[in-house]
Amino acid sequence: MNHYKPRLLLYCQHSLGMGHWVRAMTLTNALSREFRVTFLNGGRAPDHQAAVADLDMLNLPPLGMGEDHQLYSQDERYSVEEALAARKQIILDEYAMLRPKVVLIELFPFGRKKLAGELLPLLKTARRDKQTKPLVLCSLRDIMVNARKDQSRHDERARWITDRYFDGLLVHADPRFARLEDSFKPRHPLQTPLLYTGFVAPGRIPAAIKPPRHGVLVSAGGGMVGAPLFQAAIQAHAINWTTEKLPMTIVAGPFLPEADWQDLVAQVKGMAGLTLRRSVPAMQPLLEAHSLSVSQCGYNTVMDILESGTPALVVPFVRGQEDEQSQRAQKLAELGLVEILNPSELTGQRLAERILQLRDFSPNPAGLNLAGADHTVRLIQELRASKNDLIPGAQSTEYVHVC
């Protein structure tokens, strides 16, 4: 029997990669069991989109962010200014039509400040809605970028917006691994309830028959900045194949620029033991079929590594102020969960050596909470039931923390 599901409006903007998209879709899959979800997608939609019941996908005029940290339009029909104006109106119109019970915004105001022009009007509208009185929540990953030149000012601004417009922060991490205050240090204490959900992992996909693990799997999330890793991997494979006959599969990712993809295709043509794939709908089954993993260290890649238990060498992506992956990699290495190769040392020869050494690495049991998607649903339900309380009394103190 069908039962009434309250409306939930989820906003997600991915820019450089697709990590935010993947995590938000994993959350959506869990949330759709209890809510009718409208997903406002602000970036380019990936080719592979798993079907989710009770999901309405609304693709906004897509925007990305370049290496200069400036917005650019991913639809030639719109300039950046035109896209921003259209997006703002679409978002407000969608809210007015849906009158959602829950508004869930990914990352903002801890990031995406260039999109404040479309998000602050939404937040103000939700706060003025005295009839629906929606629960307004922020969805955050485990580690924030904290190397900005104006970091103190940025953190204080984020704190002020959060305390003014949000009912709660959902941090998708195990607090034993990372806490928000490690990378977020406003001048004044945050008053908004902060709740740790555990990590949002896709959940293991049981296989009827598990073949023996064999070979190296190389990946870089969406692939947008994966070309240097893939080039080094091809060189490493050529070095190791002559003596070890260790097969390699490279999954380039849907966002690897087409020119880089064609370059890879040309390079691997005729190479024995090397398989090149553009993208796959799910990485975890492929990880579980391989004996070793070489990858960057994005949130979702790490979730797949931890769930699969595959011995992993991570080469964290670092660019300018973005040190999130390096921080995550260091924490994982300290727990004995991965091995690290510093990106400054990435060469074909060095990677070939580290791949062979990785065969002797046995990762420790993760011991981390990876059930964050289901826990997020429970937390939202409890927050709705106790919206007038500062901190829901039903929450376990292990997962509730006020900065």
Residues covered by each model-derived region:
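Conserved nucleotide-sugar donor-interacting segment of glycosyltransferase catalytic cores
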Residues: 92-163
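Short amphipathic alpha-helix
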Residues: 20-31
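Donor-nucleotide binding loops and adjacent catalytic segments primarily
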Residues: 28, 184, 199-292, 326, ...
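Conserved nucleotide-sugar phosphate-binding/catalytic loop shared by glycosyltransferases and other
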Residues: 3-9, 14, 30-82, 86-88, ...
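A nucleotide-sugar donor-handling region in carbohydrate enzymes
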Residues: 139-228, 253-258
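C-terminal amphipathic helix plus adjacent low-complexity
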Residues: 353-403
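A donor-sugar binding/catalytic signature common to diverse glycosyltransferases
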Residues: 18, 44, 282-326
